[in-house]
C-alpha cells in the first residue's frame, strides 16, 4: 500500500510497540462517514487496531461496525494509502509507539446496526456522522479537545485534505 505521509519525529529506536490499524473511508456525495466524539468534539475515521489473527480487511469490517454501526460491503474495499505515526512513549514498557494506519475506500450498506463500543468509546459518546470534510478538518484543528492526542486529529485532517485534493467529494461543499 502506498504511503500517504509519515508523522512524528521520533525514530523507531529502543523498545518499540507496534499497533497497526485499518480505517474506513466511506464517501457519499460531499460527505464522509466519521465517528464524532461528542465528549471531546473531534472527528475520526471509523476503524481501529488489527488483531493478530485478522487481515487488514477483516479488521476494517469489524472496527467500522463496532465504532460506527456501518456494514462495509466487502467487495467494495479498495486500498487508499497508509499513514505511519511515530511517537515517543510516556510509558515505561516501550520507548516508541509505531502505528501504521491503513486507509481503505469502501461502500457501506444504507442501514446501520447497533454500535459495540469499548468503554472509553462509550464514555466519549462516539456517534456516526456524515460530515463535510471541511467541517471535520476545521473542528479537529481549532477546537480544544482536552486530553485527546492532537497528532491523531491532525492525521485525520490531512487524510481528508488529500481526499479533497484528489477530487473524491462532489462540489456541493
What are these regions (language model features)?
Residues 85-115, 129:
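Active-site-adjacent beta-strand/loop module that shapes the phosphate/pyrophosphate-binding cleft
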Residues 41-42, 113-173:
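Nudix hydrolase/Nudix homology domain
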Residues 27-67, 71:
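Conserved Nudix-box catalytic region and its N-terminal flanking loop in Nudix hydrolases
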Residues 71-81:
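A short coil-to-beta-strand element that immediately follows conserved catalytic motifs
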Residues 1-23:
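Acidic, metal-coordinating catalytic segment for phosphate/diphosphate chemistry
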Residues 8-13, 84-86, 141, 145-151:
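Class I (Rossmann-like) S-adenosyl-L-methionine-dependent methyltransferase catalytic domain
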Amino acid at each position: 500500500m502506498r504511503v500517504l505521509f509519515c508523522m512524528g519525529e521520533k525514530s523507531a529506536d529502543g523498545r518499540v510497540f507496534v499497533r497497526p490499524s485499518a480505517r474506513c473511508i466511506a464517501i457519499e456525495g460531499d460527505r464522509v462517514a466519521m465517528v464524532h466524539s461528542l465528549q471531546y468534539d473531534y472527528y475520526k475515521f471509523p476503524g481501529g487496531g488489527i488483531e493478530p489473527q485478522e487481515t487488514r480487511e477483516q479488521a476494517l469490517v469489524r472496527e467500522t461496525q463496532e465504532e460506527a454501526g456501518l456494514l462495509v460491503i466487502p467487495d467494495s474495499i479498495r486500498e487508499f494509502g497508509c499513514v505511519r505515526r511515530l511517537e515517543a512513549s510516556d510509558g515505561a514498557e516501550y520507548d516508541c509507539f509505531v502505528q501504521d494506519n491503513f486507509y481503505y475506500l469502501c461502500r457501506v450498506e444504507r442501514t446501520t446496526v447497533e454500535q459495540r463500543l469499548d468503554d472509553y468509546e462509550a464514555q466519549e459518546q462516539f456517534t456516526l456522522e456524515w460530515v463535510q470534510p471541511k467541517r471535520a478538518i476545521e473542528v479537529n484543528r481549532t477546537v480544544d479537545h482536552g486530553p485527546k492526542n492532537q497528532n491523531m486529529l491532525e492525521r485525520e485532517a490531512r487524510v481528508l485534505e488529500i481526499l479533497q485534493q484528489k477530487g473524491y467529494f462532489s462540489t456541493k461543499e
